[in-house]
Structure formats: C-alpha cells, structure tokens
C-alpha cells in the first residue's frame, strides 16, 4: 500500500512539474530601452532572459527587444510596438500538432522562422491590423 501511495505521489509531482515548466515558451535574448509584458492583467518589466508565456502582450517603449521561442523562432520587436502571442504549441514530433499565431497589434516586428514553420509552414499565422501573413 505504501508503495502504491509513493508511486501516485511521484506521478502527481511529475505531472505538476511539467505543467509549471511548460508555461515559458520563449525568452528575451536582446533588450534595449523600455519593454514590458502584460500577463494576466499584470504589467511586468522585461529584461534579458525574462520568460515569455502563452497569451503575453509584449510592448516596447523607446527600445527594442528580441525573443527566441523554444522552437528556435526568433522575433525582433521594434520601438513603440505591441505583439500578442495568441497561440503557441510546439511538438517536434508532429507536423500538425505545432502552431504559432502572433498578432502584431502596433508597430514593426521582424520574424525568422523556427521549427514550427519547418515542420509545416501553414501552422504559422502572423496577423496585423490590416493584413494576415501565412508563412
């Protein structure tokens, strides 16, 4: 009985650990000037190595920022811009299971495709106020 309890406890610990680790989908690799993220109605200042999460709204002030996602997608956000990560799923073993949807709400963003686009370019969608770009 004790062994069963130990096994269940260990399984629950591993499950919750994976959930916590999966929140970060990328990191700030370059930061110059003011940049912040709106996350769950909180505004946080971004610095180099800050984590980026699903549904984040990344905003730049007078500076710019570079983000590298876990699939090796790189995004450079210019000053006075806003980028929302609407959807991000990365499964390196599935062409149809991965997806990246970004909304460039304001300003200029430079995108360099990573593994999601290499697996299936149709799974990348970049939206702007006036257009929609498929990779």
Model-derived features: positions:
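Flexible, surface-exposed loop/linker segments and immediately adjacent secondary-structure boundaries
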Residues: 20-64, 69-134
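Bacterial N-terminal signal peptides that target proteins for export
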Residues: 1-8
């Amino acid at each position: 009985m004790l062994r069963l309890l130990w096994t269940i406890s260990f399984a629950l610990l591993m499950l919750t650990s994976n959930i916590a680790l999966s929140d970060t989908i990328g990191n700030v690799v370059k930061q110059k000037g003011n940049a912040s993220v709106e996350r769950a109605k909180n505004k946080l200042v971004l610095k180099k190595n800050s984590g980026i999460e699903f549904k984040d709204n990344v905003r730049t002030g007078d500076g710019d920022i570079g983000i590298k996602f876990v699939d090796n997608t790189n995004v450079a956000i210019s000053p006075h811009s806003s980028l929302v990560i609407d959807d991000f799923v990365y499964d390196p073993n599935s062409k149809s299971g991965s997806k990246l949807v970004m909304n460039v709400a304001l300003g200029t963003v430079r995108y360099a495709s990573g593994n999601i686009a290499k697996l299936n370019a149709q799974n990348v969608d970049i939206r702007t106020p006036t257009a929609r770009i498929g990779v």
